[in-house]
């Protein structure tokens, strides 16, 4: 039986889903203006230092949808078909608005997106620039070889735009749901060990090296040597992310050369505010990355629930949701988690609040969690409000 996934890190917020993404080389208005000012009367070294500071502010901004559907009053996604088709339409709209990423959360045994690769392939076929990804797929449920084939196909359809977030997964709708998919931790293993083992197999086969002994009398002619999985998409291995809830797993991800996704909740590992704990997790990841000696620079994304109140609809939906404190609770019998606040305010207030968020500052990618049940038009408005009224003032654009 095939396996699909869910993941670590989600978002409370609006009673519906939330989002996150990174910085790229494109030169938005803030970047080009700063670069122009820096070139006059300054040394090349000083110009380079200033440009580096500007680049550090620029962020890729995408959305993260949990893909809920329900027949509750006011829901625009009343069926699985609605949720899937509107997810595609929102990705198209986000690309037209200038957003950088369309990401989807995966959950099993729930009225949410459970099988991401058909959706990712469809989004890839309908768009041309935007990154498409997951945040995250639960590797406890996954056959890593079949997953590599699905991911390779989706990546090729999109022209190499897949950003695949995977993780150990979060508490599920059912008890030990992976058992129904045919998986069971080996003796002495935890389900987290099993998930990390599946992830390591996935990373190995994504390298594209042959490992399977060919049949001497095959149905079709084989190339020489051991055979690899097909279709293989070159470069996908470098676009795998790990959704880490703790500093320990963030360090593990860095050692393996995975990018980092950190969401709207993480393990509560100190008495510090959420954004500071998350910033420390990111720093631990970057330190471990440097120690590992990887040649490329890693990417880091954080997810946030951010709503700019620019019209009466915004105030009606989110005017009372500006939670100025973090929340702490148990996500299972033993794990205490800290949930990040929801940002909902007028743009000028939001700008000041977001300047203080050290984890956002440390990330190159911001994913905005969206209330998908409110429909494509409203969610496009939510994304556009951040891109237009907030991001430029913070140097993100």
Language model segments and positions:
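Compositionally biased, low-complexity flexible segments
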Residues: 2-49
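Alpha-helix-loop-beta-strand connector modules within alpha/beta enzyme cores
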Residues: 113-137, 384-396
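N-terminal beta1-alpha1-beta2 module of alpha/beta enzyme domains
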Residues: 47-130
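Conserved, mostly hydrophobic/aromatic
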Residues: 61, 98, 106, 123, ...
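Glycine-rich, proline-tolerant flexible connector loops at the mouths of alpha/beta enzymes
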Residues: 101-123, 264-275, 367-380
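An alpha-helical appendage that flanks or caps ligand/catalytic pockets
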Residues: 50-57, 185-229, 262-263, 270-364, ...
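Flexible, glycine-rich active-site loops centered on histidine and acidic residues
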Residues: 58-80, 141-211, 268
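Hydrophobic faces of well-ordered beta-strands that scaffold small-molecule active sites
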Residues: 61-65, 102-104, 132-135, 162-166, ...
